[in-house]
């Protein structure tokens, strides 16, 4: 069976990693400012979409400006600011994409393909980020990046045959992705692909989605090939906000772990993913520590009872 993943040379991968390593990280103030500018851009784009639906045709720039109560100069300025801010936030967080993609390096997808998928997730995270909620962007973006990568892995093997005209469009998309990646020194965003291909952004995203192919959830992934894909996929009920709250819990727990017994520390670390980033089930923790599932449950309860008594900081988590 052929694969849709491109074959990338080690030199290309190395050049990409060197290129993104030169990008300066954003300060907290820049993150806040850029986040607000992107929010404004997304509001303007939403208004344009609503206007298009209402009018039944593509609105003129004048109609768009009037709908958002701006003159043409201010509309252009805010669009340009938002696009620049979005680009800056993406470029400054590409190292985060790489660090997450490394966790999923295996035979099913090329490393740069994983990075490409993660970059698309990062782009969505930038678009959805609300700086007023006080989240650190990298924590919020982690959820979007990991979701994009794991879903791409889950859809890697095709179960249906696509029409030839769709396949041709997907091949053109893939070629453009590779060319842009080489020109930019990084993965191309959906917006950049849409501009080069002269296609609507949503259509490009639809083609990207079509280009992903499903595999069995029983497939083994990870460095040691001992983890099933279904263990890596996000809970459908989870959300970026849930993930940020879980990260806050992890941080608070680390500050109190010293008060627990070594065995309690091990249970809490594995259950909440304090060391490896992924939470394990009671059964998996039991296997790691060579103790029963019920013993794990008891140790976790004892540890959480102690932590609850010791700090009001955990009250909202322990109550949930």
Curated annotation (Swiss-Prot):
It is found in: Cytoplasm. One of its GO terms (cellular component) is cytoplasm. One of its GO terms (molecular function) is DNA binding. GO terms for biological process: DNA-templated transcription initiation. It comes from the Bacteria. Residues 168-243 are annotated as: Sigma-70 factor domain-3. Transmembrane segments: none annotated. Residues 89-159 are annotated as: Sigma-70 factor domain-2. A motif (Interaction with polymerase core subunit RpoC) lies at residues 113-116. Residues 256-310 are annotated as: Sigma-70 factor domain-4. Keywords: Cytoplasm, DNA-binding, Sigma factor, Transcription, Transcription regulation. Its main location: cytoplasm. It holds the Pfam family Sigma70_r1_2. Residues 282-301 bind DNA. The keyword Cytoplasm applies. InterPro entries: RNA_pol_sigma-70_dom, RNA_pol_sigma70, RNA_pol_sigma70_r1_2, RNA_pol_sigma70_r2, RNA_pol_sigma70_r3, RNA_pol_sigma70_r4, RNA_pol_sigma_r2, RNA_pol_sigma_r3/r4-like. Sigma factors are initiation factors that promote the attachment of RNA polymerase to specific initiation sites and are then released. This sigma factor is a component of the biological clock pathway that affects the circadian expression of a subset of genes in this bacterium. Belongs to the sigma-70 factor family. This is RNA polymerase sigma factor SigA2. It comes from Synechococcus elongatus (strain ATCC 33912 / PCC 7942 / FACHB-805) (Anacystis nidulans R2).
């Amino acid at each position: 069976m052929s694969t849709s993943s491109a074959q990338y040379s080690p030199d290309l991968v190395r050049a990409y990693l060197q290129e993104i390593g030169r990008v300066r990280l954003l300060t907290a103030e820049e993150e806040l400012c850029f986040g607000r500018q992107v929010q404004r851009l997304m509001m303007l784009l939403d208004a344009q979409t609503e206007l298009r639906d209402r009018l039944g045709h593509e609105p003129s720039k004048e109609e768009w400006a009037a709908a958002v109560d701006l003159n043409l100069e201010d509309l252009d300025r805010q669009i340009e600011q938002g696009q620049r801010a979005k680009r800056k936030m993406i470029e400054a967080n590409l190292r985060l994409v790489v660090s997450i993609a490394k966790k999923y390096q295996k035979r099913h997808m090329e490393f740069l393909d994983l990075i490409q998928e993660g970059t698309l997730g990062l782009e969505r995270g930038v678009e959805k980020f609300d700086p007023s909620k006080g989240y650190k962007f990298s924590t919020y973006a982690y959820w979007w990046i990991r979701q994009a990568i794991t879903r791409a892995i889950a859809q890697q093997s095709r179960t249906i045959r696509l029409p030839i005209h769709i396949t041709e469009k997907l091949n053109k998309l893939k070629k453009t992705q590779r060319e842009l990646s080489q020109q930019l020194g990084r993965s191309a965003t959906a917006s950049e692909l849409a501009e080069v291909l002269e296609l609507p952004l949503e259509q490009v995203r639809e083609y990207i989605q079509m280009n992903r192919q499903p595999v069995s959830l029983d497939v083994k992934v990870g460095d040691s090939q001992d983890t099933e894909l279904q263990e890596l996929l996000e809970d459908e009920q989870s959300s970026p906000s849930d993930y940020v709250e879980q990260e806050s819990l992890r941080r608070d727990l680390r500050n109190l772990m010293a008060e627990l017994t070594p065995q309690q520390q091990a249970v809490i670390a594995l259950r909440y993913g304090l060391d490896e980033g992924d939470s394990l089930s009671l059964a998996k923790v039991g296997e790691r520590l060579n103790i029963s599932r019920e013993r794990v449950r008891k140790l976790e309860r004892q540890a959480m009872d102690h932590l609850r008594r010791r700090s009001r900081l955990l009250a909202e988590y322990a109550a949930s």
